[in-house]
Swiss-Prot record:
Reactions mediated catalytically: 1,4-dihydroxy-2-naphthoyl-CoA + H2O = 1,4-dihydroxy-2-naphthoate + CoA + H(+)
Domain of life: Bacteria
Sorted UniProt keywords: Hydrolase
EC class of the enzyme, as a word: hydrolase
Name of the protein in its database record: 1,4-dihydroxy-2-naphthoyl-CoA hydrolase
One Pfam entry name: 4HBT_2
Species assigned in the record: Rippkaea orientalis (strain PCC 8801 / RF-1) (Cyanothece sp. (strain PCC 8801))
GO biological process, one term: phylloquinone biosynthetic process
High-level lineage: Bacteria, Bacillati, Cyanobacteriota, Cyanophyceae, Oscillatoriophycideae
Amino acid sequence: MNDYTRTIRLSDTDAAGVVYFASLLSICHEAYEASLEASGIDLKSFFRDSEVVIPIVHAEIDFFRPLYSGDRIIITLTTLQLKDTEFEITYQVGLVAPQSSLIAKAKTRHVAINPQTRQRTPLSESLMQWLKSTENSE
């Protein structure tokens, strides 16, 4: 699953009434989790694995127009494996039809590490399969 739909909630907005930038990054992370789950990865064990953790080491987001409470959005994610220990996810955020223009674009970079040594470690086979199923075909 590369598409995730969601309604913007009041709690996602800031004092100006628009989506707070960190909230949209959090929503993008929801799309990442939903995609992992749809591919058959058990989220409970994925996030509690004691041998490998996958922290985000870089995040960026660009907004092209504001989002408001009640807006229905669709997030399309694609992945790119950068190294045997690292991958990147690109999120394209748009309004659900009839207005399907690009609202925002985000990117997160993730690195697999051993939680005890904090050293890089290869991505798991299940994560490699997920990356292949969601990779950017451009």
